[in-house]
Regions:
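Adenine nucleotide-associated cytosolic modules
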Residues: 1-3, 7-198
Length: 198
C-alpha cells in the first residue's frame, strides 16, 4: 500500500485502520492519504527532539520525557479536491507531493528565497530548503549571504562545513554543500552585509 491512486483505495485503507476505534473518518482519511509522505524538516525536528531525550537519559542530569509524544499537524494539510494531484511519480519529491500535492511542490520549486546568514541556523535552513526542492525550477533560486569565514569552532554546530573548509567563505561553502545534497537547486552566494548587525 505504498501509493494511493484513487479516492476509493485511501477510503478502504482508512476503514482497515479504523477497526473498532472511535476515530473521526476525516482523520483516518487524512492519515491514509498522507502516511507515505516524508518531510525532511519535520523529520529533522522530531529527530532532534528524540536525540535530546536520549542525551538526557544517558547524561542523568536532566529527566527525559517519560510519556508518549504526539505530534499533529493536520491543519497544515491542504483541502483535497483530487487524489491525482498527490500521486507518486517516482520523483525525489514524492514524499512532499503525497502530503501537499503537486501544485504545492511546483510552487516550492519556483520559489525565490533570500537567506541571511550561513551559520548554524542558516545551514539547517539551507538543508531543509534543498530537501524540499525550493529553487529547483529555472525560475526558482536560493540566495544566501554571509560575510564570515569558517572557523574551527563552527564545525561542531554548522554541519555543512568540514575541517578542510576552515578559512573559506561560509556562503560559498554552504552553497556547494547544498548543491551536493540536491544538484537541481539553484544557489547564489553573496558575501555582502545586509544590515547594521548582520
Amino acid at each position: 500500500l505504498h501509493s494511493f491512486p484513487t479516492r476509493r483505495s485511501s477510503d478502504l485503507m482508512a476503514e482497515a485502520f479504523r477497526g473498532d476505534l472511535e476515530v473521526s473518518p476525516a482523520v483516518l482519511r487524512n492519515f491514509a492519504q498522507t502516511c507515505c509522505g516524508e518531510l525532511g524538516p519535520v523529520a529533522a525536528a522530531m529527530g532532534g527532539a528524540a536525540a535530546q531525550e536520549v542525551l538526557k537519559a544517558c547524561g542523568g542530569k536532566f529527566a527525559p520525557i517519560r510519556q508518549f509524544l504526539y505530534y499533529d499537524a493536520f491543519e497544515a494539510l491542504p483541502p483535497r479536491e483530487s487524489h491525482e494531484d498527490c500521486r507518486e511519480e517516482g520523483s525525489r519529491y514524492d514524499g512532499i507531493t503525497v502530503v501537499f500535492g503537486r501544485e504545492f511542490q511546483q510552487r516550492l520549486s519556483e520559489s525565490r528565497v533570500f537567506l541571511v546568514g550561513a551559520g548554524a541556523i542558516g545551514c539547517e535552513m539551507l538543508k531543509n530548503l534543498a530537501l524540499l526542492g525550493v529553487g529547483t525550477s529555472p525560475r526558482g533560486k536560493i540566495i544566501v549571504t554571509d560575510m564570515d569565514r569558517i572557523e574551527r569552532s563552527n564545525l561542531s554546530r554548522q554541519f555543512l562545513f568540514r575541517g578542510n573548509d576552515v578559512g573559506q567563505s561560509k556562503a560559498r561553502t554552504a552553497a556547494r554543500a547544498v548543491q551536493k545534497m540536491n544538484p537541481a537547486v539553484h544557489v547564489d552566494c553573496w558575501e555582502v552585509k545586509v544590515g547594521q548587525f548582520a
